[in-house]
Amino acid sequence: NIPWASKMKGIYNGEEVPVMHACGHDMHTAILLTTAKILYEIKDEIPGQVKFIFQPAEEGAPPGEEGGAELMVKEGVLKNPDVDAIFGLHVWSGLYAGQVYLRPEGIMAAVNEFRIDLKGVQTHGSTPWTGRDPIVTAAQIVNSLQTIVSRSLPLTEAGAVVTIGSIHGGVRSNIIPEDLYMLGTIRTLDNNMKATVLERLEQIVYNVAESNNIEAKITYLVSYPITYNDPYLYEEILPTLERVNGEKNVHL
């Protein structure tokens, strides 16, 4: 019963349910509106032009549709006047009010969401040798995927995460199902690491599946690039943040 609960409804599992995305994006809008109001009041003191960009679909458009920053850029948001630099922010629950965290280069991870489909041969659990088990194969794949980060990446340079968050397969305790699918997420702060993770993901999934005589398919669902802070602009803005917030409140 939170006071800011959304009144919107959506369909989930065939039923109408309340829908809310409580990531703080309403705060982003309020912050940008307030910034625009303040800068408008001192516009004669600003040696240049400032453009305020309100981005819809901040976390991506619905499947099959265009939206977010990519569509805005395509439609000319960075033109007339041309944009030389962009500064943005994201609220963070781990920081107290008045505190700022920033760093040069990668600050928020790239996201790649994927689906793995496995197809075997259904059989009764009492005679597993007469079928091909996608559940055993899935277990081997999940375990093997954990070695991507721990054994294939230089973690002293940047972090990365590979997560399987959802597995769906089977309907009874004594039936080995024909198929199964898994949903997962990759997060990386370095493009070379991302390429390595994607390469190793495919090697592991297809080779483990083949070793179990299982058909496998990987589908990439969503891809967001790294949020990257230009090192020059980072150095330019740092003194201002320290002056406004106090050095002790700026975390690097």
Predicted regions and their residues:
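Histidine/acidic-residue-rich, glycine-tolerant segments that coordinate divalent metal ions
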Residues: 2-20, 27, 44-166, 171-175
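Residues within well-formed alpha-helices
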Residues: 34-35, 67, 137, 208
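Hydrophobic residues in beta-strands and at strand termini
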Residues: 40, 118-120, 188
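Active-site alpha-helical elements of protease catalytic centers
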Residues: 21-39
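Conserved strand-to-helix beginnings and helix N-cap segments that scaffold or border functional pockets
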Residues: 32-33, 65-66, 99, 128-131, ...
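Residues within alpha-helical segments
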Residues: 36-37, 70, 139, 185
